[in-house]
Amino acid sequence: MNSIHGHYHIQLSNYSAGENLQSATLTEGVIGAHRVKVETALSHSNLQKKLSATIKHNQSGRSMLDRKLTSDGKANQRSSFTFSMIMYRMIHFVLSTRVPAVRESVANYGGNINFKFAQTKGAFLHKIIKHSDTASGVCEALCAHWIRSHAQGQSLFDQLYVGGRKGKFQIDTLYSIKQLQIDGCKADVDQDEVTLDWFKKNGISERMIERHCLLRPVDVTGTTESEGLDQLLNAILDTHGIGYGYKKIHLSGQMSAHAIAAYVNEKSGVTFFDPNFGEFHFSDKEKFRKWFTNSFWGNSMYHYPLGVGQRFRVLTFDSKEV
């Protein structure tokens, strides 16, 4: 399966800063099943003003960090402004409109919201949009950090925010999340292998089961478009007779890819994390299955083939702390 570099891979025309552009046209932007055609004619001076405002928005403002440098002296990662940052901001905005519907549905199926988090808006988006390799989203890195934190009996959000409340970021955690995503986006690098290596360094290992007299990692792939959600949910909820397991779930479609995560426990239920919507808990697997099938899949817009509604891959992990 292709590596997950963010939400969407989009081809944009390259414009040099010195060109005398009379118009800029974004055509056939596809977000989920929504086809958006934006044609905007701008004078050269007006274009300069808009670009200047966008660059200023992405490069200035209150830091909202607990300190300027990490504990080992590294600065928060940034890169030069690119036009793709504008496109990604538009996509994040559309995805953020689905947040209320997803969160409001949780209680209807007997679930609870543990933490309201969304990488598609607010201060967190402001931090990731400043680097070209994180502007599209850091779902893979967020899921990896969420699994590690949960396995350690901690909350990712206590580690990400000062005092566990939105407002000020702990730069060490923010830097670590962004760097893992950046490392996975490098040329000639397999992002899955980068994440696996990071897991190993942090006490997380792939679950191995015996097949044909050999130990192999639990790695389930399939399609959601033609086979529905049963195969995907079975892979997420299967604990292989052990009673628990961490799941890193890759979803992909024609234009995009996304990562979500879960901790499944036969006794305590399912804790589910989606970087676009937050962390939720369901007291048993059946409640989670019904919510995912009847509400979440549609409300999130993940069911569209143009989005992430075609293929899946579910990996199962264990931790020394569990």
UniProtKB/Swiss-Prot annotation:
GO biological process: proteolysis; symbiont-mediated perturbation of host actin cytoskeleton via filamentous actin depolymerization
Any one of the GO CC terms: extracellular region
Matching InterPro entries: Papain-like_cys_pep_sf (IPR038765), Peptidase_C58 (IPR003951), Peptidase_C58_Yopt (IPR006473)
GO MF term set: cysteine-type endopeptidase activity
Effect on the protein of changing C139S: Loss of function; abolishes the cleavage of ARHA
Alphabetized Pfam families for the sequence: Peptidase_C58
Keyword Secreted: yes
Intracellular or extracellular location(s): Secreted
Entry EC number(s): 3.4.22.-
Primary role: Cysteine protease, which is translocated into infected cells and plays a central role in pathogenesis by cleaving the C-terminus end of the human small GTPase RhoA/ARHA, a regulator of cytoskeleton. Once cleaved, ARHA loses its lipid modification, and is released from the cell membrane, leading to the subsequent disruption of actin cytoskeleton of the host cell.
Quaternary structure and partners: Interacts with human ARHA.
Name of protein: Cysteine protease YopT
Native species: Yersinia pestis
